[in-house]
């Protein structure tokens, strides 16, 4: 699993926190950030440079003109797909954790209100 990331030398893809991608001249720059260890100010990161793929395409469907376009490297596209899988999974886990915590807070509120209601009923019984 994550063969493209492993081919870049990333041995523990599960430690990836996030990534950024930017274009610089004729290159795409991929920067991968790893989870911070306790006591670290900055996250560890690695940077990779991918040359953009050049293609010559028809400029318009009617004429005979051609133009050169640049696209993201196919290898980089595969790496980004794997990074998206990792980063999306992390977001899903965070969302699930948030939902569980919200459900617990709601349950706590319901139980607290019910206890107060029962105690009030008991108080009414003891006054008689």
UniProtKB/Swiss-Prot annotation:
**Which is a Pfam family this sequence falls into?**
DUF3461
Say which domain of life the source belongs to.
Bacteria
Q: Which InterPro entries match?
A: UPF0325 (IPR020911)
Family assignment from sequence similarity:
Belongs to the UPF0325 family.
Which HAMAP family does the UniProt entry name for this protein? UPF0325
Q: What is this protein called?
A: UPF0325 protein KPN78578_01770
Phylogenetic placement of the source organism: Bacteria, Pseudomonadati, Pseudomonadota, Gammaproteobacteria, Enterobacterales
């Amino acid at each position: 699993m994550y063969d493209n990331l492993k081919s870049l030398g990333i041995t523990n893809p599960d430690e990836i926190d996030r990534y950024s991608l930017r274009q610089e001249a004729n290159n795409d720059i991929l920067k991968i950030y790893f989870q911070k260890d306790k006591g670290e100010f900055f996250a560890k990161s690695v940077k990779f440079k991918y040359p953009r793929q050049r293609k010559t395409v028809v400029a318009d469907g009617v004429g005979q003109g051609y133009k050169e376009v640049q696209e993201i490297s196919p290898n980089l596209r595969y790496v980004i797909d794997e990074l998206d899988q990792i980063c999306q999974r992390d977001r899903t886990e965070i969302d699930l954790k948030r939902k569980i915590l919200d459900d617990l807070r709601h349950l706590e509120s319901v139980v607290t209100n019910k206890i107060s209601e029962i105690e009030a009923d008991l108080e009414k019984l003891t006054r008689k």
